């Protein structure tokens, strides 16, 4: 069964990267790979631009900064959020409430397959409200999320 596109074309996407993702490329490369956060952001901007979409990205190691960025997204006209909450996946009611408060659809992305890792990583405070969750595809999971978001908006 084909998914039904949402009526209007998507124009503005925000990608949020949570704590420690600034260390990609050097932190546990056997788990997260050698690709850096800058590489991921470049690939996302290139893909979005090629598809006629404006993409902003933001990384923080601080929960409050991520919450503030989510709040700002609403007034900026952000229509879709792709978020890798990283460790906040398993702890942050604040991120969950911020996403619910702005009522912007989102996809949760994880580089590793969190279900093949420690049991505490198996629970997400964000997943049940997300459009979808992508995990275990490495940095390409971000591109899959972006393509899905654009395709669902008739782009």
UniProtKB/Swiss-Prot annotation:
Gene (UniProt): aroQ
Keyword Transport on entry: no
Catalytic activity reported: 3-dehydroquinate = 3-dehydroshikimate + H2O
Transmembrane stretches, start-end: none
Positions of the catalytic residues: 32, 110
Name of the protein this chain belongs to: 3-dehydroquinate dehydratase
The organism's place on the tree of life at top rank: Bacteria
Signal peptide: none
Species per Swiss-Prot/TrEMBL record: Ralstonia pickettii (strain 12J)
């Amino acid at each position: 069964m084909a998914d039904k596109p949402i009526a209007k074309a998507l124009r503005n996407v925000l990608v949020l990267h949570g704590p420690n993702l600034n260390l990609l490329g050097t932190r546990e490369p056997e788990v997260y790979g050698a690709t850096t956060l800058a590489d991921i952001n470049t690939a996302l901007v290139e893909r979005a631009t090629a598809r006629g979409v404006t993409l902003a990205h933001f990384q923080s190691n601080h929960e409050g900064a991520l919450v503030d960025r989510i709040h700002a997204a609403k007034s900026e006209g952000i229509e879709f959020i792709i978020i890798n909450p990283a460790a906040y996946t398993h702890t942050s009611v604040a991120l969950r409430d911020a996403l619910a408060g702005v009522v912007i659809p989102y996809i949760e992305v994880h580089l590793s397959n969190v279900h093949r890792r420690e049991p505490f990583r198996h629970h997400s405070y964000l997943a049940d409200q997300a459009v979808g969750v992508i995990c275990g595809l490495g940095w390409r999971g971000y591109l899959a999320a972006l393509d899905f978001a654009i395709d669902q908006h008739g782009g």
